[in-house]
Design a protein with these regions (language model features):
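Formylglycine-dependent sulfatase
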Residues: 1-189
Length: 189
């Protein structure tokens, strides 16, 4: 089977699953765990009290003590590659995120657009009955796709998340943030 045939088959199966999931009510298996992923930019591995660091984070400590501590993950020095690797389970270059989205180029591994052949974790969870949400900074969408007019096919709600509330780019104004609820602009009071 050629790579085209494999890709076409995988894409057809994914579409069939998505269509079936709308007809058949998919629920998580009995006893399935809740999944909460917290990514904090610019904080070193050993900084939080959960990992023996000096920053006291009692809520995170409580969550970590009753769950899984993810401590075997490669992070990069910038956020976009780390985010896309965490949310896909794949190396950042496989995800075409060699740097932050604003510095994307046409070079392989650095286009700033996750290939359709890499399934986002949220989509895998959704197809297994989980409800998914993304809140806060996204910074996984190529800079030329960050606009209320779209395209929005690489935004969180088109990558498996049922709910998104936050900002798409790498930064926003702290006093008058440019926020989205899904793909709709949030009007400031």
């Amino acid at each position: 089977m050629t790579s085209f045939q494999r890709g076409f088959s995988a894409q057809s199966c994914s579409r069939a699953l998505i269509c079936c999931s709308r007809v058949i009510d998919i629920t998580t298996p009995a006893g399935a765990p809740n999944v909460l992923i917290v990514l904090i930019d610019d904080m070193g591995f050993g900084m939080s009290s959960s990992f023996g660091g000096p920053i006291n984070m009692p809520t995170v400590d409580r969550l970590a003590s009753g769950g899984l501590r993810y401590n075997q993950f490669h992070t990069t020095a910038v956020c976009s590659p780390t985010r896309v690797a965490l949310l896909s389970g794949r190396n950042h270059h496989v995800n075409n995120m060699g740097g932050i989205t604003e510095t994307a180029t046409a070079f392989p591994g650095n286009t700033g657009q996750r290939p359709n052949s890499v399934a986002p974790l949220a989509e895998m969870l959704r197809l297994n009955g989980y409800s998914t949400g993304f809140f806060g900074k996204n910074h996984e969408t190529a800079a030329w796709e960050v606009s209320p007019s779209g395209p929005t096919d690489r935004w969180p709600t088109r990558q498996g998340f049922d709910k998104f509330y936050g900002f798409i780019g790498g930064e926003t104004n702290q006093w008058a943030p440019f926020l989205y609820d899904g793909t709709a602009v949030v009007e400031l009071p």
